[in-house]
A protein has these predicted regions:
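Conserved N-terminal entry element of GNAT/NAT acetyltransferase domains
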Residues: 1-12, 147
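Acetyl-CoA-dependent GNAT
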Residues: 8-85, 96-98, 102
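Active-site acidic-Proline motif in GNAT/NAT acetyltransferases
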Residues: 83-89, 113-114
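Conserved active-site alpha-helix within GNAT-family acetyltransferase domains
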Residues: 93-94, 114-131, 137-141
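Conserved GNAT acetyl-CoA-binding A-motif
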Residues: 102-114
């Protein structure tokens, strides 16, 4: 396996990216039925994220293993997804570094309060908890986390 490389999202990446989103979130929250949200997610991907966000793909040996979405106008990092078999391999940190390059004035994101693994990951990369809220889809409580240079 070679090191991950980054590239810009292409429309041909949609099916693989959506499938990776499903697989990754299902692994992180097996008690939730993300398959039931797939149509909603695909519509959100096409109509809410792609028109405003820069999407960067991480791949190795030609296989997509992660992606990050960043809206540089609002600093909002909506999604960072890494294939579970690549968790703790540096892919997420590489994607966050690219997100910081895209939005050098700062980044904001929301993370489920019970996602201790992700909160620790973001903290290690310089993010601080700056607020609390509620995920509008799941109703789960979230931390707003922010990074500023």
């Amino acid at each position: 396996m070679s090191a991950a490389t980054l590239r810009r999202y292409q429309p041909r990446d949609e099916d693989v990216s959506v499938a990776l989103w499903l697989r990754t979130w299902q692994k992180a929250y097996p008690e939730l039925d993300f398959a039931a949200r797939l149509d909603w997610w695909r519509e959100r991907w096409r109509n809410e994220l792609l028109p405003v966000a820069e999407v960067v793909i991480a791949e190795t040996d030609g296989t997509i293993i992660g992606f990050v979405t960043v809206d540089p106008r609002t600093f909002y990092l909506d999604q960072i997804v890494v294939a579970p078999e690549f968790w703790r391999c540096g892919v997420g940190a590489t994607l966050i570094a690219e997100a910081k390059r895209i939005s050098p004035s700062g980044l904001d994101l929301d993370v489920n309060i019970d996602n201790v693994r992700a909160i620790g990951f973001y903290r290690r990369l310089g993010f601080l908890i700056t607020g609390v809220g509620k995920n509008p889809t799941s109703g789960k409580p979230v931390h707003r986390m922010s990074w500023r240079p």
